[in-house]
């Protein structure tokens, strides 16, 4: 791939697509964080989604500044005494990739948690408490932060000879005799965590789909035999409401998992190729291909971190109600305020109220 082709991809991705996606995603995730805080952390799923929003926000905060380093002036100006690619790698690329993988692992945990809600509905609340969810999410952040620290221990910015410009510039240098080993450990952790995340997402979502289907069949049998078991209509409606809410939340998690799998599959392939092709890296023989592929992967990962708000609003009743309260005037002004979502829960509540009046 020619240098000019690589530059076109870099500019489109980092000067056009990524800043727009990043800024929209930052606003969306700030809204997510505020809503989850206001809804409280009495449920473990809120704790997990709050951690996911923080991870997405941090990833996007390091995505937007790419444009400050990767632009025509910083890449080709002879007046600068620092290497733009090296600065981008150290200051934004490493943190961005760290929080992207954090997002992957937290999404896996959320999916497994939802799966357990269907497989072990009576035990899941005692098994996965809000406190335990917070500990697991914090442990994921700690593991990925350790992975980031390895990179900063092995590399730093300092004066070095830049062969491309034949001058001394500030760029990345290895700081220790074992820096190569530390970077290899970091790469292995990064690769394993991402491959594990994708594999776990596939397995857990298949299990979740099977569990949802089994619960639906079980509920259908209960409804048929309810009169024989002297179950009241009110208890049936309560069970229907709970079942519907769980299924709706499961669908939301499945959509989030699908988007994450699609957007992160590309970067996982890049990691695999780089492990088997020595020159396929940031500075090797195939650096243009490597950098171009990563720019596309960055845009895809940024999109994944930005679209969650849409699924939360469409599929989470508590989130939607809180969102509507926060932005009621603005939503009403543009005519999209959902006065009645025609959800099953609204119908059940109305029927229950009617029976109570009777």
Each model region followed by its residue ranges:
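First transmembrane helix
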Residues: 10-38, 199-203
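Helix-to-loop junction signature of class
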Residues: 18, 22, 58-78, 96, ...
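Non-transmembrane, juxtamembrane loop and terminal tail segments
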Residues: 220-239, 325-358
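Fourth transmembrane helix
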Residues: 58-62, 69-72, 99-109, 116, ...
């Amino acid at each position: 791939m020619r240098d000019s082709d690589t530059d076109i991809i870099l500019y489109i991705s980092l000067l056009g697509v990524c800043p727009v996606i990043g800024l929209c995603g930052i606003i969306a995730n700030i809204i997510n964080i505020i809503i989850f805080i206001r809804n409280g952390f009495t449920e473990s799923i809120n704790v997990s989604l709050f951690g996911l929003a923080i991870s997405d926000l941090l990833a996007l905060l390091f995505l937007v500044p790419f444009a400050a380093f990767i632009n025509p002036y910083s890449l080709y100006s002879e007046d600068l005494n620092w290497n733009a690619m090296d600065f981008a790698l150290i200051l934004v690329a490493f943190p961005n990739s760290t929080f992207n993988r954090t997002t992957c692992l937290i999404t896996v945990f959320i999916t497994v948690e939802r799966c357990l809600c269907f497989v072990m509905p009576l035990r899941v609340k005692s098994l996965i408490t809000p406190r335990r969810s917070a500990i697991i999410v914090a442990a994921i952040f700690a593991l990925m932060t350790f992975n980031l620290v390895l990179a900063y221990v092995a590399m730093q910015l300092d004066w070095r000879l830049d062969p491309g410009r034949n001058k001394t510039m500030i760029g990345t240098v290895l700081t220790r005799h074992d820096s190569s080993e530390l970077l290899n450990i970091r790469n292995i952790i990064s690769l394993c965590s991402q491959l594990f995340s994708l594999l776990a997402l596939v397995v857990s979502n298949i299990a979740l789909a099977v569990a949802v289907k089994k619960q639906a069949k079980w509920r259908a049998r209960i409804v048929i035999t309810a009169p024989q078991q002297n179950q009241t209509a009110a208890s049936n409606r309560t069970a229907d409401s709970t079942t519907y809410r769980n299924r709706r939340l499961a669908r939301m998690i499945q959509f989030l998992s699908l988007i994450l799998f699609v957007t992160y599959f590309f970067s996982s392939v890049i990691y695999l190729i780089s492990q088997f092709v020595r020159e396929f890296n940031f500075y090797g023989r195939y650096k243009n291909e490597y950098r171009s592929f990563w720019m596309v992967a960055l845009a895809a990962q940024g999109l994944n971190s930005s679209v969650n708000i849409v699924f939360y609003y469409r599929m989470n009743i508590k989130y939607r109600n809180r969102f509507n309260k926060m932005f009621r005037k603005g939503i009403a002004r543009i005519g999209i305020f959902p006065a009645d979502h025609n959800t099953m829960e609204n119908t059940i509540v109305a029927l229950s109220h009617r029976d109570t009046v009777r």
